[in-house]
């Protein structure tokens, strides 16, 4: 029949993230074990990145003249999230600031992430609320790990303005065709994209997977990444670069009591 069956798995206690997305029993999300059951940063699934993406210069954010240590990709992926609601419109999880998060990031906030399964599409929204008494700077993004048979089998269809391996300095214009290849002797490979015209898509001729990442205008950056001989490729929508929160005019700022919602989606197909 033409009716496909899909399942979306969310693990609130592991960073409030997607940990599985299957189509007719075929898994599209890659899981790293034993990392799944450890308490360190999840390097699998679909981590939520907040209040920053990547690693800021010196591993710190500077707020009001004081340096605050920051984990790679922020801390939302290290926290257990609370289940706010479960219903026909999907699952909503919440993460609120605590004394521990304020040690890293001196702001009061609530994050709400909603996951909704629409056939073979997972629709995801993130609402950031400033609950404090001062303007709140941040960036956000997601770090999805998708199953891949082998890097050389993965063919990307992406339109963007620039493409490089380092976000610092002048960014070279993107080639006509975006590719992700490994340099001799390197253990990983990365592409940092700006001016992305979503959706980003890849097709894997080895496992027959086609994955589409679409995103609203709050995202204009993309990251492609692959490491070791692992069977995954990351195709990630980002709102900021590693040091954006430290750089004037390069991050989001919410005024007191303001909120912002961003939306994106993952669509999985068999080809």
Model features per residue range: what roles?
Residues 9-66, 234:
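Acidic-aromatic substrate-binding/catalytic surfaces of carbohydrate-active enzymes
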Residues 204-242:
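Glycine-rich active-site loops that engage anionic ligands at enzyme catalytic sites
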Residues 135-137, 144-217:
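Active-site/ligand-binding surface loops and adjacent short beta/alpha elements
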Residues 61-69, 253-270:
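Short Pro-Gly-centered flexible turn/kink motifs
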Residues 112-114, 189-190, 249-254:
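Beta-strand-rich interaction surfaces with strong enrichment in secreted/lumenal proteins
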Residues 66-119:
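Extended, loop-rich substrate-binding clefts of extracytoplasmic carbohydrate-active enzymes
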Residues 10, 126-132, 226-227, 268:
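Asparagine-centered strand-capping/turn motif at beta-strand->loop junctions
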Residues 2-5:
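Short, small-residue-biased leader/transition segments that mark boundaries at the very start
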């Amino acid at each position: 029949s033409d009716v496909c069956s899909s399942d979306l798995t969310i693990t609130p206690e592991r960073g409030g993230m997607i940990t599985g997305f299957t189509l007719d029993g075929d898994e599209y999300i890659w899981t790293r074990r034993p990392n799944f059951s450890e308490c360190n940063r999840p390097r699998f699934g679909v981590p939520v990145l907040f209040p920053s993406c990547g690693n800021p210069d010196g591993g710190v954010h500077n707020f009001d003249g004081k340096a605050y240590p920051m984990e790679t990709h922020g801390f939302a992926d290290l926290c257990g999230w609370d289940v706010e609601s479960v219903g026909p419109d999907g699952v909503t999880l919440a993460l609120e600031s605590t004394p521990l998060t304020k040690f890293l990031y001196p702001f009061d906030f609530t994050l709400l992430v909603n996951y909704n399964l629409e056939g073979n599409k997972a629709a995801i929204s993130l609402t950031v609320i400033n609950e404090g008494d001062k303007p709140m700077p941040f960036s956000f993004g997601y770090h999805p790990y998708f199953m891949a048979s082998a890097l050389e089998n993965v063919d990307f269809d992406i339109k963007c303005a620039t493409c490089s391996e380092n976000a610092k300095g002048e960014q070279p214009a993107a080639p006509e065709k975006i590719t992700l290849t490994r340099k001799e002797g390197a253990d990983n490979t990365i592409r940092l994209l700006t001016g992305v015209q979503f959706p980003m898509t890849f097709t894997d001729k080895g496992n027959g997977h086609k994955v589409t990442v679409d995103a609203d205008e709050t995202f204009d950056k993309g990251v492609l990444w692959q490491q070791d001989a692992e069977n995954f490729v990351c195709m990630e929508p980002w709102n900021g670069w590693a040091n954006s929160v430290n750089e004037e005019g390069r991050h989001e700022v919410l005024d007191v009591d303001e909120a912002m919602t961003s939306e994106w989606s993952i669509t999985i197909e068999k080809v």
